[in-house]
Amino acid sequence: MKLLMLCREPRLYSCQRLKESAEDNGHQIDILDPNRCLLKLSKNAPHFELYYQVNSKSEPYLLPDYDAIIPRFGSTSTRMGCAVLRHFRTKNVFCLNDDVAFLKARDKWLSLQLLTEQGIAVPNSALSGAEFSATQAILQIQSPTILKTLHGSQGIGVILAENRKSAVSIMETLTQADVPLLMQDFIQEAQGTDIRCFVIGDKVVATMQRIGQEDEFRANFHRGGSAEKIQLTEQEKVLALKATKCLGLDVAGVDLIRSKQGLLVLEVNASPGLEMIEKTSGIDIALQMIVHIEKQFKR
């Protein structure tokens, strides 16, 4: 197969592992930055064209056809990355997470709404408009309060407000800067830990418990967190698969938390990192992703 990976940083661990696994299985793979693409629409055939420019001084060239697409772009490239995914979906090319599912997962509030609609428990959450009083809005959520920007990954854009006064101050400041925030209950009993479930297709292929640094409420690897192996219950496996299906994803990193209220889904990531979970679990997740693509291509 001829594969295309959409990625801004090809040297990242996840991109390199996927490249190695694809090539080891006999596939050709290109790694391209979606922000260097140009999409063209025309009333005359061909109606859809995709060009690529290696750098600002180079001559753009028309990209060839591909058999499958692997999206690995970050939140800052979501708009262009999803436009490229839609281009390929229009041409009936298999995308390992298409643009529709990707956009659902990348919008934190929308994803919480969709999960809740399907009866999947999430932390108590609230979203207020720019003209709604921050002082009144924050009363809907417990204190301490988690504040999150609607788009972001790797723990970036997540703030713990220790009291209502600081929460209101943060909300008012960021609202003035046109940065909307969602509010969530802080689950204190979790003590800075969560469970990452890596889902491919209809199977949870790997898991780990993530542990935040001392005095750090975020358990993300990129925030200095560590990880250890963990055994999932059958209920947790079912929940991770249900959350993945709810957003229409083929591949997902589902973050769960064990709370006094029961199991909660914190987030569903459409482009989950491989490094920490491969090293913790000892499972070759990159290979399983390539095998999943092969199975879809043979259908």
From Swiss-Prot:
Mn(2+) 2 binds at E267, N269. Binds 2 magnesium or manganese ions per subunit. It holds the Pfam family Rimk_N. Residues 112-294 form the ATP-grasp domain. It comes from the Bacteria. GO terms for cellular component: cytoplasm. Mg(2+) 1 binds at D255, E267. Mn(2+) 1 binds at D255, E267. ATP binds at K148, D185, F186, D194, R218, A219, N220. Keywords: ATP-binding, Ligase, Magnesium, Manganese, Metal-binding, Nucleotide-binding, Protein biosynthesis. The keyword Manganese applies. This is Probable alpha-L-glutamate ligase. InterPro entries: ATP-grasp, ATP-grasp_RimK-type, ATP_grasp_subdomain_1, RimK, Rimk_N, Rp_bS6_RimK/Lys_biosynth_LsyX. Its EC number is 6.3.2.-. The gene is rimK. Belongs to the RimK family. Gene3D superfamilies: 3.40.50.20, ATP-grasp fold, A domain, ATP-grasp fold, B domain.
